[in-house]
Amino acid sequence: MTAAALAPARPEGFFEALAPQGRRVLFALAAIAVCMLFAFPVLWLVLTSLRPGTGVYYVHRGTEFTIDNFGEVLAQEIVVRALLNSFLISTLATALSLGVTATSGYMLSRFRGPLPNAWFSLIYIFRCVPYVAWVLPLYFVTQRLGIFDTYWGLLLPHVAVHVCFFSWIMKGFFDGIDPSMEYAAMIDGCSRWGAFLRVALPAAVPGLTALAILCWLYTWNEFLFALILTAQNTPILAVVMAQFVHELGMEWHLMSATAVLALGPALIVTIFGQKYVIRGLKV
């Protein structure tokens, strides 16, 4: 008899012992459990936004639902202003960030020399700095420049954060584009800038679309910069929700209604932009 025949059989693991159908059922149950884990807070938020104020605290009134909370929230001018400001700042920050990030990523991908190396090192250093450590210096800078509690006071920090992070991703997108197409365009008379605009940039559209969605969602959900760099002139929705916490308690029903209003645009962008994000990140 051979040594292989005399060797003891290797015990099967738990997943190997299961039949293929049993493994599929097990994975399906695990997926359902994970989905429920993430969906439960959202469901609770929506249900709380539809309950009257007393229904949040008393179980016997928990089955009463109303949409009056949304009317009460939208009747407050500061909430409407915050909703519009959040949308405007998210859109403008995304547009500015894409313009700077595209050129930054292209430079890091195509050029070598002191300037690209210095820019790469600067981005790397800023990415090593903890996010919270930026807040206090930015507060003093915006105060000195006179842009505290203005659109620019929020836009510039967001653009700086996006450029430092997404330049790395854009570099990867441009690294995946064959530079010979740009060289062919330059032989036909295009300048380097023309080759970038007419050849490299259109080829990077899937990546730019993915970054645009990520930038918009990040800015829409951002809280810390909005809390420190704004006051009354530029209310942001993430900060306005905190006004329902006061010395008399927490107005959970109104806070939840405002949170659902904030969740709506982000959910729409995520649902319709999911395939673009996946496609862009696969480039």
Predicted regions and their residues:
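A hydrophobic, multi-pass inner-membrane permease signature
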Residues: T2-V283
